[in-house]
A protein has these predicted regions:
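Histidine-dependent nucleotide/RNA phosphoesterase domain, centered on the 2H-phosphoesterase fold
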Residues: 1-233
């Protein structure tokens, strides 16, 4: 990670460490409720799936029984958030998106057609109060894509909240009183080194709870020669 990325990661880690260690409770009010969002995501490749599968087996010894693990065949990398999720119903601005969604999606295809493929290196595991994430970095290609997406959405009159980090969700579940420090220590000790090649992204409605299932709304191909993993059936 470069200096800026390390600083961003450490800020997030410190923020969640305070919550986990001092309170040991889930802060997200959406926990256990239906929760949907519209995101830009890339599907994970077999090597990344293998690493996540091993991490999930370890986490089963640390996290509560109600933890929800992302099915390995649906493992994805979160690149940008188009509509922030909202518990118990549709995301805010969903109706606005529906009115101009077709036009906006077509523009997104144009943006992605000009984007370069990206190499993402996953090195860190981040434990938050509600999820366990793999944190990735790229050479700047996805940052350029995210800025273009933001400019496009703003121009369409839609709010855009860029994700703080490029990440892959391993599990949705948080610590309980008594195991928060252990979980943080586990995450700190996990150093991985997986390089991921992203040659295409999807725009997905993501129904996060309870099934973690996703439904494809539109597929956006990045330009360039890098191979893209086969998409789950």
């Amino acid at each position: 990670m470069n200096q800026e990325e390390v600083g961003r990661y450490n800020q997030m880690r410190a923020r969640y460490r305070a919550t986990v260690v001092q309170r040991g409770l889930r802060e997200d009010t959406a926990w256990g409720q239906p929760y949907d969002a519209l995101n830009v995501q890339a599907w994970a490749s077999p090597p990344l799936k293998d690493h996540v599968g091993l991490l999930q087996e370890e986490l089963k010894q640390l996290l509560p029984a109600d933890t929800r693990y992302v099915p390995v065949d649906r493992l994805h990398i979160s690149v940008a958030c188009l509509l922030e999720g909202r518990s118990g119903g549709r995301p805010e601005n969903a109706s606005r998106w529906e009115k101009i969604g077709a036009e906006c999606l077509e523009s997104l295809r144009d943006v992605c057609a000009r984007a370069r493929p990206a190499r993402i290196r996953f090195e860190r595991v981040l434990s938050t109060d509600v999820a366990v994430l793999l944190v990735g970095r790229d050479g700047g290609e996805l940052d350029v894509l995210r800025r273009c997406i933001g400019d496009l959405m703003t121009g369409c009159g839609l709010e855009y909240r860029p994700k703080e980090i490029i990440h892959c969700t391993v599990a949705r579940g948080g610590p309980t009183p008594g195991n928060g420090a252990e979980l943080l220590h586990w995450a700190d000790e996990r150093y991985i080194d997986v390089e991921e090649f992203v040659g295409g992204v999807d725009v997905l409605w993501e129904w996060t709870y309870p099934s973690l299932a996703t439904t494809t709304e539109a597929r956006l191909e990045l330009a360039g020669p890098l191979p893209r993993p086969d998409r789950p059936s």
